[in-house]
């Protein structure tokens, strides 16, 4: 019997074996000499295209870039505007969660995106972004 999830039918269809395979394959490009934690992400767009990203660390830690934002920035720089789900994977950590910065950036571009966590055994956990970041920061325009 299948476990219930927080996903709707449409994003479930988007979570293909192809997406899972590409995300697992991409992790080898991760550059993590400091934390030793390899992370990869796959962003599935409404166009059907998949964009992958990996974490890229820097000795000046604040300049490190997470896999989620790299995947998103690649997609946006190629003209993508609608995003269905983001798959996140780390072989070292069981169900790695996105950081707050990534959730904030993702919420601006895709306020209804589904975040999918995958472990080494291809087990999945599904979270609407709003369950992970209920109240994202927004600038409120003020009239002078």
Report residues per predicted region.
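Short, solvent-exposed cationic patches
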Residues: 66-87
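Compact, glycine-rich, soluble single-domain proteins
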Residues: 55-70
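Small-residue (primarily alanine) positions within well-ordered alpha-helices
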Residues: 23, 41-42, 71, 75
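Short beta-strand scaffold segments in enzyme catalytic cores
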Residues: 36-45
């Amino acid at each position: 019997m299948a476990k219930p999830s927080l996903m709707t039918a449409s994003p479930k269809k988007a979570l293909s074996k192809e997406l899972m395979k590409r995300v697992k394959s991409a992790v080898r490009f991760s550059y993590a000499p400091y934390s030793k934690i390899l992370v990869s992400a796959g962003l599935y767009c409404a166009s059907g295209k998949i964009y992958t990203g990996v974490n890229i660390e820097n000795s000046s830690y604040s300049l490190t870039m997470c896999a989620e934002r790299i995947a998103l920035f690649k997609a946006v720089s190629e003209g993508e505007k609608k995003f269905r789900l983001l798959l996140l994977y780390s072989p070292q950590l069981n169900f790695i969660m996105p950081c707050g910065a990534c959730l904030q950036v993702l919420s601006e571009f895709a306020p209804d995106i589904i975040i999918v966590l995958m472990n080494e055994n291809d087990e999945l956990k599904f979270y609407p972004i709003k369950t992970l970041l209920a109240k994202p920061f927004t600038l409120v325009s003020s009239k002078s």
